[in-house]
Amino acid sequence: MSIIDSTTGANASNLPLSPLLVILGNTGSGKSALAINLAKVIPAGIINADSRQIYSRMDIATAKPTLSEMLEIPHYLYSFIQPDQPFSLAEYQTLAYQAIDSLHTQNRLPVLVGGSGQYLKAVLEGWSIPPVAPDETFRAALFEKAEKEGGDVIFTELEKKDPQAATQIDPRNIRRVVRALEVIHKTGGKFSGLLIKNPPPYRVFKIGIHIPREELYRTVDLRVEKMLEQGLEAEVRSLLEKGYKASLPSMSGIGYRQIAKYIEGGISLTEAVEQMKFETHRLIRQQNTYFRLTDTNIHWITLEESRSNGIIQLVCDFLAAENKNEIH
């Protein structure tokens, strides 16, 4: 019997729910490496839950899996959106569910991997995204304000109007901050209050990789240096030469924004690198609002444990425990 055979029929009330493994944690914590190692032993497919890794042509600063890794193991929702192509949270949620169902059909374990809390919550909690039509005039005014005064200004506005929504949205993702403010503006209510939850019929096991903050800071600082060595400047130059403007939401990601500013003469390369490190540290702190060590629904492991055979046994135990919601 395959690993999924015993859980087929997730929508039938008298049958066990189909399994979904989630690997989460801070940027630079080794999530992708763990997922790939597991998929080499257990029939599985990897689904991206990182809002930066959806874009094509943007590989180095987003730290995507390598091409050889993607060819060896089924990967979903990586590099499928052009840098100037609009893409909504609702679209991601729909595609993620399709990928999960596809893997179940293939008798493979779906492994949802990423550090974008909003992507993870939208899928795991079954958010019903508010169907509010865009207000282009309102949007344009906010984007202009963010460009002139900085994204922090409009994020602060969101924090005042809807503190709960502010904890669920990456402050660097200007497009999503604008969308939340737009919904608040058009409905008169809170964006967070409009998110109706309808959890999908999956038996979920969440594994979180925890690395002490100072150790993680050192790790990501070294990764920033490595990105420069791998050709990040050339990658950003290529994007700009192809007509992808630095003001695009995709270009607001760490690494692209700073190197674009350096290329355009706004800052030195040294300043760009320091800003990349600072923003990565900030992202780690932001992610910690999503991924808390006190969350008993997450099975936390160390980096060393993520590299051990014990983690494989843990996942096998999860697959064997059809009627349990947690593995301890």
Curated annotation (Swiss-Prot):
Record field: catalytic activity: adenosine(37) in tRNA + dimethylallyl diphosphate = N(6)-dimethylallyladenosine(37) in tRNA + diphosphate
InterPro entries per UniProt: Dimethylallyltransferase, IPT, P-loop_NTPase
Any one GO BP annotation for this protein: tRNA modification
Residue numbers binding ATP: 25-32
Site residues by UniProt (Interaction with substrate tRNA): 116, 139
Entry-linked Pfam families: IPPT
Residues reported to bind substrate: 27-32
Sequence segments annotated as region (Interaction with substrate tRNA): 50-53
Assembly and binders: Monomer.
Family: Belongs to the IPP transferase family.
Function comment: Catalyzes the transfer of a dimethylallyl group onto the adenine at position 37 in tRNAs that read codons beginning with uridine, leading to the formation of N6-(dimethylallyl)adenosine (i(6)A).
Name of the molecule in the record: tRNA dimethylallyltransferase
Protein species of origin: Dehalococcoides mccartyi (strain ATCC BAA-2100 / JCM 16839 / KCTC 5957 / BAV1)
Gene it is expressed from: miaA
